[in-house]
């Protein structure tokens, strides 16, 4: 079974919940899993303006932080980020910007990649956020495995590019969110296993 790393940024916890669900799905399928958040780079005064952001920072501060070793180790890379004006957060982008040495050595190529995101509003930049991630993955020489509409659950979340969660008033994942994440994980692992067998 493949080795999968789930690398994400979450300010208030929604993308964190998505990452944890993806991690659980991968473990159930027998994959080796690393779950890693990226370093927080926002100024403390910005974080302190939202109680949920402060609380989430406390929840994850002792958990492992993503490293280049995690990327090199993995056969499958899932990345997650909230939308920020139709793109990934600066925190995740800062991590991506450190990958040059691995990229230059060809160590990011030929891995399976996919993404997930969340926004407060419907169509709040989810597709463009995923596509911006995928542009990076193409530069890596990665194999992007989007879910498309390969399972009926994709008609519930409506996002063929990855998994997108609309938070609205709540950041809790619902049955459709969980099913979409489970399907994405099963799909990337299935493709990776075919490529490595």
Locations of regions flagged by a protein language model:
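Short amphipathic alpha-helical patches
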Residues: 49-50, 94, 101, 119-122, ...
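Short, glycine-/small-residue-rich phosphate/pyrophosphate-handling segment
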Residues: 109-156
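Aromatic side chains
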Residues: 8-9, 85, 95, 113-116, ...
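A charged, well-structured terminal subsegment
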Residues: 138-159, 167-180, 188
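Short connector loops at secondary-structure junctions
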Residues: 34-45, 148-161
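N-terminal beta1-alpha1-beta2 submodule of the flavodoxin-like/Rossmannoid cofactor-binding fold
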Residues: 1-105, 166-197
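Short clusters of hydrophobic/aromatic residues that line enzyme substrate/ligand-binding pockets
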Residues: 108, 161-164
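Phosphate-binding/catalytic loops
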Residues: 118-122, 163-172
């Amino acid at each position: 079974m493949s080795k999968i790393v789930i690398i994400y940024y979450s300010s208030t916890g929604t993308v964190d919940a998505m990452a944890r669900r993806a991690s659980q799905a991968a473990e159930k399928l027998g994959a080796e899993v690393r779950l890693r958040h990226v370093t927080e780079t926002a100024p403390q005064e910005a974080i302190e303006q939202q109680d949920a952001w402060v609380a989430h920072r406390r929840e994850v501060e002792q958990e492992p932080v993503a490293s280049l070793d995690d990327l090199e180790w993995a056969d499958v890379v899932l990345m997650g980020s909230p939308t920020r004006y139709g793109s990934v957060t600066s925190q995740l982008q800062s991590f991506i910007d450190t990958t040059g040495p691995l990229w230059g050595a060809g160590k990011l190529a030929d891995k399976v990649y996919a993404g997930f995101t969340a926004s407060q509003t419907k169509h709040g930049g989810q597709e463009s956020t995923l596509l911006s991630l995928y542009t990076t993955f193409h530069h890596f020489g990665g194999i992007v495995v989007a879910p498309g509409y390969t399972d009926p659950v994709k008609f519930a979340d409506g996002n063929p590019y990855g998994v997108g969660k609309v938070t609205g008033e709540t950041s809790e994942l619902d049955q459709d969110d969980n099913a979409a994440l489970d399907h994405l994980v099963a799909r990337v692992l299935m493709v990776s296993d075919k490529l490595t067998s």
